[in-house]
Amino acid sequence: IHVAGYCSGRFAEGTLRDAQTKQWLAFLADKFGQSAPEVTPARLDGVTSANVDRSVLDAMAVAEDRAGFAIEVLAARGATAGATLALSDMHKTAGQQLVALANGNFDDSGAQSSSPGQSDPRQKVYAIDQLLANPTTIADKASGQTVPTAAAIEMDCARAQIKAVTESKSSTESDMLPILAALAAKHAYTAFQLGYPAPDAALFE
């Protein structure tokens, strides 16, 4: 994750490599009866400020919100492996944290606060017709493969967050980059755990 955090030109590669490495370690741990790598929830607990473009935080918040909505709807229908309300809630919490960071809405104790008129890019409801039509597996444009639907949602979230950072022109020196890289990497790792292909051919152009 250090590559992604301190070399913005390799943010995408470093983020996905981190998730890929954790997946490989998890595979080896399972094979040899060892404990899998500990991965904390994909949230921003304890982060109370962010010196990064608002556009980056907004785009990442939308990615979280979209994934949370999709997972929630699929969880309610009960036909999608890996789609749980707990996973949906984690996405929505991260989305709220990103919006709060963008608005600077933290009080002296570090708790989130709210003020009227603050910007919130989240739509809360999104078009997910393709997901509903393909609740078990779906064609993944990025990898060109058919993958488990919940895994596709997680990887789409990770890729959207990576794109938000890499397309920003003023976030290259931010000390938030390692934190944002870790967030996106956790979503990519979750995607692998849910069946998304981990080989390089599926991840890198």
Give residue spans per PLM region.
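All-alpha RGS (Regulator of G-protein Signaling) helical domain and cognate RGS-like helical scaffolds
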Residues: I1-E205
